[in-house]
Amino acid sequence: NRFNEETLSTPAEKNSNPVNVSPKELAAIVFTSGSTGPPKGVCYMHKTFDGQISALRENFGMQEGEVDMTTLPIFALFNPALGITTVMPEIDPSKPAKASAQSLVETLVDFEVTTAFASPVIGRKIADWCEHGNLRLPRMNRFFLAGAPSPPQLVEKLASVMDNGQVLIPYGATEALPVSYCTHADVMRARKGIEQGEGSCLGKALPGVSIKLFPVSASPFGNEVEEINEGQVGEICVAGPTVTEEYYRMPGATFDSKFRYDSQIYHRMGDLGYFDVDLSLR
């Protein structure tokens, strides 16, 4: 037991008084993956975490008492605020392709995991192992796939081994998370178009999040920037309670990726997209 007797014998109220902070006060510095350059420190304010926790609870039904297997350490930050237990599998987050499929599935089963977040590489390992071993994941409520495009056949296979859960594909980045999401059913409806090259299904914006498309440009956006016409492909830009406002001590990077539009601070996701006939982001 890592808790000493003094800690265990201390009245709960002594350690439960919250610290008074401003919603815009810095709460954490979370670094990007570095996949598009040197990792940048993203400033998470207390209001950012509040927005993210609310989004996870209200949109995905995550509840106190659940057990989460997360393959990316950053997502373990949310669980204590949700009353959720975090289980970390034996995996090197920088080398997910080397993870043991057997170990991953055993972790899900042995710890009675109800929710999980992983890349499509991990999702495929789990789905394939379950399929070959004729295994089921009856306690899973949801499985998030993110970090790379999730092929429809993978989404379908993973959903098929979950008796009572669903596969969810959220869209976002360290600087803005989550932004939108789609379900297994959404992917199946769009499957033909996805396989014909119409783009991955990213779903619709979460409540309170604004997604707009702007002309593709390598230059910073100024006050004169205007949205593109309906049906065109543009750069995905987002604003809302889950969107951060600056990088830590990197004014140049902040200037390049943030801009003000309609009285809100938007973040440039660096991805191209369009809205389909159902107004879902692709």
Q: Can you say where each PLM-predicted feature lies in the sequence?
A:
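Short, flexible, glycine-rich and Lys/Arg-enriched loop motifs at helix boundaries
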Residues: 88-102, 163, 188-197, 218-226
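Short Gly/Pro-enriched turn/cap motifs at secondary-structure boundaries
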Residues: 20, 198-205, 227, 263-264
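Conserved AMP-binding A3 loop
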Residues: 20, 27-54, 85
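Gly/Ser/Thr-rich phosphate-binding loop
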Residues: 3, 84, 115-117, 128-197, ...
